[in-house]
Amino acid sequence: MSVNLDDAPLYPTFDPGNMLKTIRDLPEQVREAWAVAQDAPLPDAYKEIDHIAVGGMGGSAIGGDLLKGLMERRGTVPLEVVRGYELPAYLEGERMLFVASSKSGNTEETRSLLDQALERGMRVVAVTTGGKIAEQARERELPLWTFDYDATPRASIGYSLTLLVGLASRLGVLSGVEDAVDETVEALRGLQSKLLPQVETEDNPAKDLARKLEGKLPFFFGSGFLTAVARRWKTQMNENAKQWASWDVLPELNHNTVVGFGLPESVVPHLVVVFLRSNLDHPRVKVRWEVTKDLLTKNNVLAYEIYGRGESPLTQLLTLIHFGDFVSYYVTALNGVDPTPVENIDYLKERLAEVE
């Protein structure tokens, strides 16, 4: 039986953990995180840095990916995101800043990176709600940026990104942020009013796109500062809707992925591509979007496009994330699954704990 996304009683039945509330909270997460960032501890010596590395995993790492996109447009120092147990060999010394990003404060990979950063004499900031990372930060008298929000890491994206944006702003390595935050909060509120469950499908673009993704294998394409947004859409489909999804990036995909658009023939009817676009894209990338769409059409692959809203890169980035979170939520309803639990991740952690 087809699921009616306009049936209000539907949502509490598959969402007992109220993931919807955390999605709706995004504008307030951004506002509150920005306020926290203005008063969080940051020694003046930290402003003498040449490089930033954000260490994290999963929902605690994506904020770093998103900040990287913003820094590539308006930043004055390079930023990289480290996922895993080992810092690159070139990261060492007090002119490099390591940011330990872990909502729980207990992520084993991030704890390993933190230990290495301290051993190598790097400046360190901890961004967390508590756990062992917070304990270590207090013991070592490191700047500790804490927030209190009861949700999964992926549902705390407003904090994990905006705290990092605030840190970059206070370090003096990212400009023009304060006005962008105000614009973003207002844009998110306006967008949300069009995407909530009480807005019927014919007037709700998130529900409409979710219907088009139902039963399909979605690919999300981004470019430039929206590259990490494509990754976010993919991981939200994985974790919320409990299904396969993938992502790719222009212009790189024009040099490889496009060659495989037509095969296997048995798979092509099940594919759908979503372009995540910006009016700030490079002019040649704008041309590439159109040609890529033509190639998909020639190979009988459905493609849709969504644009970020607002003027600033931050606003466009977060409005696309907000849209994608609602889309994944409605696909979750269509799939008949609970968006909150991540049983396979829990299983992995249990197995890993057995061999510590």
PLM-predicted stretches and their roles:
Residues 15-22, 29, 37-41, 47-50, ...:
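Active-site phosphate/pyrophosphate-binding segments
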Residues 46-193, 211, 278-300:
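Glycine-rich phosphate-binding loops that contact phosphosugars or nucleotide phosphates
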Residues 340-356:
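Short, small/acidic-rich helices and loops at N termini and domain boundaries
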Residues 1-18:
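Polybasic, low-complexity association/targeting segments
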Residues 82-83, 243-254, 302-311:
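A generic structural motif
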Residues 258-343:
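C-terminal active-site/capping subdomain that shapes the small-molecule cofactor and substrate pocket
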Residues 35-37, 76, 167-177, 241-242, ...:
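Short helix-capping/linker segments at secondary-structure and domain boundaries
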